[in-house]
Amino acid sequence: MPWLQVRLAISPEQAETYEDALLEVGAVSVTFMDAEDQPIFEPDLNTTPLWSHTHLLALFEADADPEQVFAHLRLLTGAELPEHQAEVIEDQDWERSWMDNFQPMRFGRRLWIVPSWHDAPEKDAVNLLLDPGLAFGTGTHPTTALCLEWLDGQQLEGTQVLDFGCGSGILAIAALLLGAREAVGTDIDVQAIEASRDNAQRNGIADEKLALYLPEHMPAMQADVLVANILAGPLVSLAPQLSGLVRPGGLLALSGILAEQGEDVAAAYAADFELDPIVVRDGWVRISGRRR
């Protein structure tokens, strides 16, 4: 069935007023969207920030009159409306549309990420089966891609790999499929641990090959390879801990870092690692190196 969609261009200060007003005039859903592709990272505790330029989208039953909606909004807010528009959108099979947009992706020479509803494009390649999720990483983000390509370029046979902040487990699983002897994943989120375990089982990874821990339960170790795709702030503050988790001569790859943060993160690791040139993609960077 079709829907009437109302769009308002608002500031963060207007958000609550217009959200309440739209619900009061009959909206069945209200959604906030970034109007200018402006990222928000590492917000202050107990805050839910909005973008400085936000689109507020509201859905109404198809027979709603947009002019009446706008008139009621003016009455309820006591002000002229910000930039606004209304359009009828057709319903569709959203699940099918979403699935069609997620295709197999190649990283480096050998590695593919393949959703369950697709055949592997190259049967003899290293194929990691992973369906897209909402929270933990599927290879579509530049930072994940940078880490996957780096792993594909390493000689991982016989190594122990630590995936710090494992999320979906995609990096640890990729390392195992690329030849690592064993992998360890750690994350502060219990759901991430479960997602990693489920994805490992889907890819035929034996339980003894992948150990998963909350940080407080992780044993002392020094890995041959450490990958961490988290945020710049934690990467800097945890630099002594992460450096200590890599054996002398071992390898490190870090991402989740905006381009303008790259030099600061690199500086936090320069004393302990011989660093490679920073790799940049779509405003994000990867920092890698070898433990001194």
Swiss-Prot record:
Q: Which UniProt keywords apply?
A: Cytoplasm, Methyltransferase, S-adenosyl-L-methionine, Transferase
tRNA processing: present as a keyword of the record? Answer: no
* Catalytic reaction equation(s): L-lysyl-[protein] + 3 S-adenosyl-L-methionine = N(6),N(6),N(6)-trimethyl-L-lysyl-[protein] + 3 S-adenosyl-L-homocysteine + 3 H(+)
Tell me the enzyme class: transferase
Q: Where in the cell is it found?
A: Cytoplasm
Establish whether keyword S-adenosyl-L-methionine is in the entry: yes
Q: Where is it chiefly localized? A: cytoplasm
Instruction: Give the UniProt entry's GO cellular component terms.
Output: cytosol
InterPro entries reported in the protein's UniProt record:
Ribosomal_L11_MeTrfase_PrmA, Ribosomal_PrmA_MeTrfase, SAM-dependent_MTases_sf
Which GO molecular function terms does the record list? protein-lysine N-methyltransferase activity
Coiled coil regions in record = none
Q: Residues of the signal sequence?
A: none
Give the residues the record marks as binding S-adenosyl-L-methionine: 144, 165, 187, 229
Mention one GO biological process in which this protein takes part, according to its record: methylation
Superkingdom of origin: Bacteria
Q: What is its EC number?
A: 2.1.1.-
Similarity field: Belongs to the methyltransferase superfamily. PrmA family.
Know the name of this protein? Ribosomal protein L11 methyltransferase
Species the sequence originates in: Pseudomonas putida (strain ATCC 700007 / DSM 6899 / JCM 31910 / BCRC 17059 / LMG 24140 / F1)
